[in-house]
């Protein structure tokens, strides 16, 4: 049977043009008043998926 894309992972992880896996950072959705501005600025933007997780994530996305 054909492997299906894991939709939860597909919504959270994007593949860059060079093939790197990028993800949004956690802790920036709500309850931000109690967090320092420095921390919320640091959490902006995307980050690479950890090397230990890349193989598993590619399999979930059907790119393995």
Swiss-Prot record:
Biased composition (Basic and acidic residues): 21-36
Gene Ontology terms for molecular function: structural constituent of ribosome
One BP annotation, GO: translation
Positions of the UniProt region annotated as Disordered: 1-50
InterPro entries the UniProt entry points to: Ribosomal_bL35, Ribosomal_bL35-like, Ribosomal_bL35_CS, Ribosomal_bL35_sf
GO cellular component, one term: cytosolic large ribosomal subunit
Name of the molecule in the record: Large ribosomal subunit protein bL35
SUPFAM superfamilies found in the cross-reference section: L35p-like
One Pfam match: Ribosomal_L35p
The gene coding this protein: rpmI
Sequence similarity: Belongs to the bacterial ribosomal protein bL35 family.
Protein keywords: Ribonucleoprotein, Ribosomal protein
NCBIfam families on file: rpmI_bact
Gene3D superfamilies: 4.10.410.60
Biased composition (Basic residues): 1-14
UniProt key word DNA damage: no
């Amino acid at each position: 049977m054909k492997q299906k894309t894991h939709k939860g992972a597909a919504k959270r992880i994007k593949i860059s043009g060079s093939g790197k896996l990028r993800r949004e950072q956690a802790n920036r959705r709500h309850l931000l008043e109690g967090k320092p501005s420095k921390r919320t600025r640091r959490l902006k933007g995307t980050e690479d998926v950890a090397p230990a997780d890349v193989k598993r994530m590619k399999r979930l996305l059907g790119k393995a």
